[in-house]
């Protein structure tokens, strides 16, 4: 992987991790265009995912600080309930990671046709949430957190946007727009770090076998590109959800999905 390829893919990851257009789908398309695969692709994916987690921590540091201050009061307050909701939302993705990880990895290697189909499904979800009748829930309930977690578990499919799926699900449930976007970005931090740890163990084994030769420069460039673009996209996406402008991303996903399918079948 050349440094300029890492730059492009890093920016792509940073933007699409938060914008509801599927980071996994766009990374798969970008990697296919650049001919990047195997251990190099896995190493780079870990680096840019960790970068976007860091960008979440930077943009939402006030909310994270609020959570930890409340936790250390050691009482059942709003902050403790928030953490419980995040833990509840992790149950479905945890089950998928433990029992279906190999199956999911097979799907990721099945080509771009599935990516195109899932992009179309993302478009439908965003469109449904846009036209859904708005309801006013002040806080995300434990039940809603679990349902949103189910949506996140489904979004392991390449091309099905995690942020788009979770936010659209929350909107259909009638949750508060601003709080929903923040919850969606915070709930994914533990699963991403857990997956990065597991994949990192694979990289260590691969390095011992000499199966990865991606340069340090490419990793650093990709990491910084993903972090900076992720900071911009995270803040932007929160404002987009507040203003209810997801329909534009539904149109984009529909076009991107259709083009991907057409190119795959040609």
From Swiss-Prot:
Main location: membrane
A biological process term (GO) from this entry: regulation of cell shape
Domain of life: Bacteria
A GO term from the CC aspect: plasma membrane
EC number per UniProt: 3.6.1.27
Lipid bilayer topology: Multi-pass membrane protein
Top enzyme category: hydrolase
Subcellular location: Cell inner membrane
Transmembrane segments: 41-61, 80-100, 107-127, 140-160, 180-200, 214-234, 246-266
Cell membrane found in the keyword field: yes
Similarity comment text for this entry: Belongs to the UppP family.
Note: Bacitracin is thought to be involved in the inhibition of peptidoglycan synthesis by sequestering undecaprenyl diphosphate, thereby reducing the pool of lipid carrier available.
Protein purpose: Catalyzes the dephosphorylation of undecaprenyl diphosphate (UPP). Confers resistance to bacitracin.
Name of the protein described by the UniProt record: Undecaprenyl-diphosphatase
Taxonomic source organism: Phocaeicola vulgatus (strain ATCC 8482 / DSM 1447 / JCM 5826 / CCUG 4940 / NBRC 14291 / NCTC 11154)
Gene expressing this chain: uppP
């Amino acid at each position: 992987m050349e440094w300029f390829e890492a730059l492009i893919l890093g920016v792509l990851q940073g933007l699409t991790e938060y914008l509801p257009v599927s980071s996994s789908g766009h990374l798969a398309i970008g990697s296919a265009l650049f001919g990047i695969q195997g251990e190099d692709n896995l190493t780079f994916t870990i680096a840019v995912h960790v970068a976007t987690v860091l960008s979440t921590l930077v943009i939402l540091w006030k909310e994270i600080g609020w959570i930890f201050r409340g936790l250390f009061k050691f009482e059942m307050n709003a902050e403790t309930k928030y953490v419980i909701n995040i833990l509840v939302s992790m149950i479905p993705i945890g089950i998928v990671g433990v029992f279906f990880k190999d199956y999911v990895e097979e799907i990721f290697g099945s080509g771009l046709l599935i990516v195109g189909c899932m992009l179309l499904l993302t478009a439908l979800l965003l469109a449904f949430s846009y036209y859904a009748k708005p309801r006013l829930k002040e806080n995300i309930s434990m039940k809603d957190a679990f349902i949103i977690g189910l949506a996140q578990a489904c979004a392991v499919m390449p091309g099905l946007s995690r942020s788009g799926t979770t936010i659209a699900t929350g909107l259909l449930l009638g949750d508060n727009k601003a709080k929903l976007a923040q919850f969606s970005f915070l709930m994914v931090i533990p699963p991403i770090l857990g997956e990065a740890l597991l994949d990192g163990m694979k990289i260590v084994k691969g390095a011992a076998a000499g199966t990865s030769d991606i340069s340090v420069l490419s990793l650093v460039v990709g990491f910084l590109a993903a972090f900076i673009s992720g900071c911009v996209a995270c803040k932007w996406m929160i404002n987009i959800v507040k203003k209810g402008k997801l329909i534009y991303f539904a149109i984009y996903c529909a076009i991107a999905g259709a083009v991907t399918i057409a190119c795959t079948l040609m």
